[in-house]
Amino acid sequence: QGDKRDICRLPPEQGPCKGRIPRYFYNPASRMCESFIYGGCKGNKNNFKTKAECVRACRPPERPGVCPKTSGPGICLHGCDSDSDCKEGQKCCFDGCGYICLTVAPSGSP
């Protein structure tokens, strides 16, 4: 498991070849799978043929519940990367500036 997550932290790498192959990489800063152009050889393992493949490999599992609505710019802290960094009953939520663990509302009620 640790090795897989490490792959997902690697930067997108085009490689030395001159191909122009659309691929996807996981961007830990945005927590999204994003497109990049792969040259066709070498590079690293944060390189997926489809967005779905990237999401399956790298997106951390989400806990149920809804993050509370933000009111203002929030505190610029980076306290978590995913829900699994938070205690039970909390989610990793964007608070207007950074990501922090917050107690969630039950699903369906923001």
Curated annotation (Swiss-Prot):
Its Gene Ontology molecular function terms? serine-type endopeptidase inhibitor activity
- Residue stretches making up the WAP domain: 60-105
| Residues modified as Pyrrolidone carboxylic acid | 1
| Domain BPTI/Kunitz inhibitor residues, every copy | 8-58
Q: What is this protein called?
A: Chelonianin
Q: Which Pfam families match?
A: Kunitz_BPTI (PF00014), WAP (PF00095)
Q: Which SMART domains does its entry note?
A: KU, WAP
What the protein does comes down to: The first domain inhibits trypsin; the second one inhibitis subtilisin.
Is the keyword NADP assigned to this protein?
Answer: no
* Residues annotated as site: Reactive bond for trypsin: 18-19
Mention any one GO cellular component term assigned to this protein in its UniProt record: extracellular region
**UniProtKB keywords:** Disulfide bond, Protease inhibitor, Pyrrolidone carboxylic acid, Serine protease inhibitor
Report disulfide bridges, numbered on this chain. 8-58, 17-41, 33-54, 67-92, 76-97, 80-93, 86-101
Q: Which domain of life is it from?
A: Eukaryota
